[in-house]
Curated annotation (Swiss-Prot):
Pfam families: TACO1_YebC_N, Transcrip_reg. One of its GO terms (cellular component) is cytosol. This is Probable transcriptional regulatory protein jhp_0149. It is found in: Cytoplasm. Belongs to the TACO1 family.
Amino acid sequence: MGRAFEYRRAAKEKRWDKMSKVFPKLAKAITLAAKEGGSEPDTNAKLRTAILNAKAQNMPKDNIDAAIKRASSKEGNLSEITYEGKANFGVLIIMECMTDNPTRTIANLKSYFNKTQGASIVPNGSLEFMFNRKSVFECLKSEVENLKLSLEDLEFALIDYGLEELEEVGDKIIIRGDYNSFKLLNEGFESLRLPIIKAGLQRIATTPIELNDEQMELTEKLLDRIEDDDDVVALYTNIE
């Protein structure tokens, strides 16, 4: 993966450490989940997951409660929209947004692409086939060990809930499954009483590409602008 990958990862982690930017995105996910499925986490799996992800980023309880309450107000009039774009060097970009003003959102995104030579927004659906949608869960290896489970035991226990792949990364375990298995996998973790530290739906490129340091640095300028937009809650590329 090389230095370009390390640069990309370090830069992304640095950006997401800015809580002032993270919290609005997390709050929107909570508000939308509460709007769609009700304000009770016990009966709304999507809301439970949104709250779990917020807590993992140390979002205060007052902020979480306020985001849930917004679901029943005019501020809760959010919609989910996905936009797609291309950049230089064969880079493909998918942007998942939550917004109360789609006109503002697309205008902002177009301005970011227009400021980058060779980059452009493309019609929705143009890049969809270049990415696989996956359910992705993270848990701590120590929590698995506390349940007296080996990784093989965990894999066997979650296969019936839609597990496709299990990966050990440092002190964490990454579980991946089909996009449509998100709810089922969540139930699998609950049945095991295994705490989840992060969960979500991700898009994984079918044919990743590698960029050299110079290409990565140029591309990063566009990705920075996109990720700094409060309406953008998730950004996916085909960069390795």
